[in-house]
Amino acid sequence: MIITVLGAGSWGTTLAVLLANKGYAVSLWAHRPDFAQELARTRENVKYLPGVTFPDGLEIAQDINAAATDADVIVAAVPSQAVRETMELLAGINLDGKLMVNVAKGIELGSGKRLSEVILETLSGVDPSMVSVLYGPSHAEEVSGLQPTTVVAASSNLDTAKRVQEIFHTRMFRVYVNTDIVGVEIAGSVKNIIAIAAGIADGIGFGDNAKAAIITRGLAEISRLSAAMGGDPMTVSGLSGIGDLVVTCLSKHSRNRYVGEQIGKGRSLDDVISHMNMVAEGVLTTKAVVELSNRLGVDMPITRTVYAMLFEHKPVEDAILDLMTRDPKPEL
C-alpha cells in the first residue's frame, strides 16, 4: 500500500513517520519546494518536529500530482483554510478508488462547510463513501514520542472507517471508529475555539472553577451546533468531543490555548500570531463558526465572546462580564 501525506507540519510529519514505521511506502509532500528539499536533505523536520528522524520508508515528494497518482491513500494534513486550495491541485488526477483521510480540524471560512464537504465539493471524482477523518486528543509531540494516544476514524461508511482504523492503528496509537462524521468534525473543530477561551482564563489568572465552566459549557455549545447540523448527540462524549476538548484546553502543547492565554495577558491577536511558528486553527474557525451559528440560529455565547475579543477588540474584562451577566437559564 502506498500512502501520500499532504502537509509537512508537525501533525502531517508525525503521521507520515507513524505510517512508515508500520511498513507502508509513504510520501510526504510539503507546500513549499525549498522546505521539501530541506526535509529530503536532513531527513528530519527540524522546524516543526525536531528530533524525529525519518524512517527509510518515508520519501519526500517534490511533485504532488505524481505522489497523489501513485497513492492508494491520501492524507490531508494541511491547515484547515488551505484544504480547498490543496485539493484543487489534485483536480486533474484520477482519484477513483482512493481513500481520502482528512486530519485537519476546522470549518471553512466563508462557506461554513466541514472539511470533508470541502474535499467532496472540490474533487468531483471522489466517492463520498471513501472520505474519512481522523480526529481526537493527539498532540504530535506525544504521538511522535510513542506516548499512548487514542483517536477516532469517522466516515459515513463503516467499512471505510474500519479501513482507516486498520491503517493507522498501532500499539501506542489506538484507533476507534464512528460513522457520525458530522458530529466528529464539528466537535474536533469547535473545541479549538473553546480552548482559546480556556487560555484567556489562564492569561487573566482565573482558577479551576472558571476553566471547568468553560469546558463544560463549551461542550454544550459543541453539542447544540452538532445537533443542528445532523450530528449524533452522543458523539460529543467521545474522543473528538470531550477527549479533544480537555486536552486542547489544558495542554502546554495547545497552540489555541496559548493564543488565548496571550490575549488574556493583554497582547493583541496580530502580535501573538506574528510570533507563532505554527497555525492556531481556532482563530479563523471562530469566524467561520460565528457565521455558521448565526445562519443556523444556534446559541453559542462562549464562541461569540471569543469572537468579540479576537476580532472586535472588546476588552477581555468587559467580554467576560457580559458573558457572566446574561439572563439565567436552565442548564440542559
Swiss-Prot record:
The coiled-coil regions, if any, are: none
Principal subcellular localization: cytoplasm
High-level lineage: Bacteria, Pseudomonadati, Chlorobiota, Chlorobiia, Chlorobiales
Catalysed reactions, semicolon-separated: sn-glycerol 3-phosphate + NAD(+) = dihydroxyacetone phosphate + NADH + H(+); sn-glycerol 3-phosphate + NADP(+) = dihydroxyacetone phosphate + NADPH + H(+)
Can you say what this protein is called? Glycerol-3-phosphate dehydrogenase [NAD(P)+]
What family does the Swiss-Prot or TrEMBL record give for this protein?
Belongs to the NAD-dependent glycerol-3-phosphate dehydrogenase family.
For this record, the Gene Ontology CC terms, alphabetical, are: cytosol
Q: Which GO terms describe its molecular function?
A: glycerol-3-phosphate dehydrogenase [NAD(P)+] activity; NAD binding
Q: Where is the active site?
A: 191 (proton acceptor)
This protein's UniProt keywords: Cytoplasm, Lipid biosynthesis, Lipid metabolism, NAD, NADP, Nucleotide-binding, Oxidoreductase, Phospholipid biosynthesis, Phospholipid metabolism
What positions does the entry give for NADPH binding?
A: 10-11, 31-32, 105, 140, 255, 279, 281
Determine if 4Fe-4S is one of this entry's keywords: no
Q: Which organism is it from?
A: Prosthecochloris aestuarii (strain DSM 271 / SK 413)
